[in-house]
From Swiss-Prot:
Role: Participates in various redox reactions through the reversible oxidation of its active center dithiol to a disulfide and catalyzes dithiol-disulfide exchange reactions.
Keywords recorded for this protein, A-Z: Disulfide bond, Electron transport, Redox-active center, Transport
Family of the protein in this entry: Belongs to the thioredoxin family.
GO molecular function, one term: protein-disulfide reductase activity
Disulfide bond entries: C35-C38
Coiled coil: none
GO cellular component, one term: cytosol
One Pfam family, short name: Thioredoxin
Species of provenance: Mycolicibacterium smegmatis (Mycobacterium smegmatis)
Keyword Protein transport: no
Name the UniProt record assigns to this protein: Thioredoxin
Length: 112
């Protein structure tokens, strides 16, 4: 990710602080570099992060090979992309598969 990215990169080590401890809802994208659908949804998530940044943090966690296995295991992520919305430190919504911007915003609307 570039430095001007609207999304936040998280790891197993930073997940508790950056996601579970966040004062606003966090949409976490579980992705991998080799995942084609993950690459398709990435620009959509950047747009949502830029437009909804006052209401929502969009975080990305790379689950490629051995990267960050604990978080993916803890939240039973078995296919990617999987996006999980956390509110007040708890998962409240799970979205599996690449979706367009309108579909993602509809999925998130009740939480924002």
């Amino acid at each position: 990710m570039s430095e001007d990215s609207a999304t936040v990169a998280v790891t197993d080590d930073s997940f508790s602080t950056d996601v579970l401890g966040s004062s606003k809802p966090v949409l976490v994208d579980f992705w991998a570099t080799w995942c084609g659908p993950c690459k398709m949804v990435a620009p959509v998530l950047e747009e949502i992060a830029a437009e909804k940044g006052d209401q929502l943090t969009v975080a990305k966690i790379d689950v490629d090979v051995d990267a960050n296995p604990a978080t993916a295991r803890d939240f039973q992520v078995v296919s990617i992309p999987t996006m999980i919305l956390f509110k007040d430190g708890a998962p409240v919504k799970r979205i599996v598969g690449a979706k367009g911007k309108a579909a993602l915003l509809r999925e998130l609307s009740d939480a924002l």
